[in-house]
């Protein structure tokens, strides 16, 4: 896949109009107007592969991988790979084959687990410190200065590692469903722009600094206590905790 994003932005400002209340760019002298133009271009190329396998409606496995090449990171870091793997085991299918399942009580049960890594690049032109026009001063002289953010040519891609394990259960001919999951998310090398000392000539600095870890549990219970040909009532209750 290839994703290319382009922006092209122009703006005009004018003040101290020659004719009052006539708001036109042409109604100002060259010393009282400013024109700016900005263009950006970003390209992201990705390659993706996936493998799926199953065995006797009991075991399922999915393995995938993606590699991205981005134009917004330095040459040594612009290629990054992130894989994922997930699997599940329908244990009620195994119990049924062995003759150990009473499906009038438990008619479906599945264990699942997954691990994934996801990469992310950054915005355009964050590697180098650019110049931009600051206005017209001193008898028409055009002013040029640094942008507010100092570039960083050592930036790395952001990464997030996620894991999840869970179980799904259905009872009494699918009248009662329980779904439980425990998950973790670990994000590191986050690209931030914290404030720095203005004595350096910049206000913000682009760096890899953020690291966020959280974990949590999700539980949902749904049931159909009343089910007839004429009436059906289903109730769902969900709960989530995270830290």
Locate the predicted segments by residue.
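Extracellular/periplasmic, surface-exposed regions of secreted and cell-surface proteins
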Residues: 1-236, 242
